[in-house]
Amino acid sequence: MGIKGLSQVIADHAPSAIKVQEIKAFFGRKVAIDASMCLYQFLIAIRQDGSQMQSEDGETTSHLMGMFYRTIRMIDNGIKPVYVFDGKPPDMKSGELEKRTERRAEAEKALTEAKEKGDAKEAEKFERRLVKVTKQQNEEVKQLLGLMGIPVVEAPCEAEAQCANLVKAGKVYGTATEDMDALTFGSCVLLRHLLAPEAKKIPIKEFHLARVLEEMQLTKDQFIDLCILLGCDYCGTIRGIGPKKAVELIKQHKNIETVLENIDQTKYPPPADWPYKRARELFHEPEVMKCDEVELTWKDPDVEGIVKFMCGEKNFSEDRIRSAMVRMQKSRNAGTQGRIDSFFTVSSQVKCVTVAKRKAQEEAEKMKKGGKKSGPPKKKAK
């Protein structure tokens, strides 16, 4: 789920934090990609006849085709992708996982009813909801990426948190995912729709955390509390408080504790034993690999290994796979020049703290002046 309604909140309250980009804008960038999100997107991309791609043995291969060609498209555009895979879910996510299990059961029931009625459109809708990435599909994609020379990171817990950590350490430019909680975990840059199908021509949305905080006049702590009020994967929300009210309350009261002290809890009842403090801690200190333990190396692809795996084992067309590999090699060679602005790089970590540092300096100046606000310059008497 990520953070419920956060993208719209940012669009409403911090529009300058969002840039609409074409993929070529990221030439020379290293990008950490939420692999699980990608695989899910590839698997729900059902073909016109309502089926997924399969090998001769009846194995689903949509995930391999999607990963292979989308990765090559990124390399064509000078992007150096890093795929980050989910580890075990945090204990606090158990409630959200239970809800997902319930929704799957409801979707299975609805699918059966749609098939009995002969409603193909409804059946397709519920089939998409039942798609789940398997362990085997994860392993096959890791094998393919290894053969392509693309670095893979296996997060101990949430992929978005690990991606955010790589961004904060300056190892990559941004996090590519559809889940907005990458910002809550501290990713300075979030890219949505980077892996959207080229044919759909969906523009990439680039969110900048520093601009969000600056324009909304929030600290990082206040932003995390806002995200918890909006709705995250780790705890419930206060009934009756929507996005507009959540923003108002955080701006007025600064944190959830003070919000709870000042709202009418008969009108806005919080969940019983609401673990918002633990959710806050999880966003502040998620379980991630230390960045000095993560080595990102892009290697030459093993063309024959790819052909053996994709064509020999998974029945893809050898001509198409070899043609795509020729294209990939050309793009790799062309992409070695890098970005001009890399010669003038300020690390992502520095960019993220600039706003907070500037605010602290402004507060210090106010204290020196006795908290007085400077007004407009007085006109000189004629």
From Swiss-Prot:
InterPro entries: 5-3_exonuclease (IPR002421), 5-3_exonuclease_C_sf (IPR036279), Flap_endonuc (IPR023426), HhH2 (IPR008918), PIN-like_dom_sf (IPR029060), XPG-I_dom (IPR006086), XPG/Rad2 (IPR006084), XPG_CS (IPR019974). PANTHER family: FLAP ENDONUCLEASE 1 (PTHR11081:SF9), FLAP ENDONUCLEASE FAMILY MEMBER (PTHR11081). Binds 2 magnesium ions per subunit. They probably participate in the reaction catalyzed by the enzyme. May bind an additional third magnesium ion after substrate binding. Residues 1-104 are annotated as: N-domain. Residues 122-253 are annotated as: I-domain. It comes from Caenorhabditis briggsae. Structure-specific nuclease with 5'-flap endonuclease and 5'-3' exonuclease activities involved in DNA replication and repair. During DNA replication, cleaves the 5'-overhanging flap structure that is generated by displacement synthesis when DNA polymerase encounters the 5'-end of a downstream Okazaki fragment. It enters the flap from the 5'-end and then tracks to cleave the flap base, leaving a nick for ligation. Also involved in the long patch base excision repair (LP-BER) pathway, by cleaving within the apurinic/apyrimidinic (AP) site-terminated flap. Belongs to the XPG/RAD2 endonuclease family. FEN1 subfamily. Residues 359-382 are annotated as: Disordered. This is Flap endonuclease 1. GO terms for cellular component: mitochondrion; nucleolus; nucleoplasm; nucleus. The gene is crn-1. Residues 359-368 have a biased composition (Basic and acidic residues). HAMAP family: Fen (MF_00614). Interacts with PCNA. Three molecules of crn-1 bind to one PCNA trimer with each molecule binding to one PCNA monomer. PCNA stimulates the nuclease activity without altering cleavage specificity.
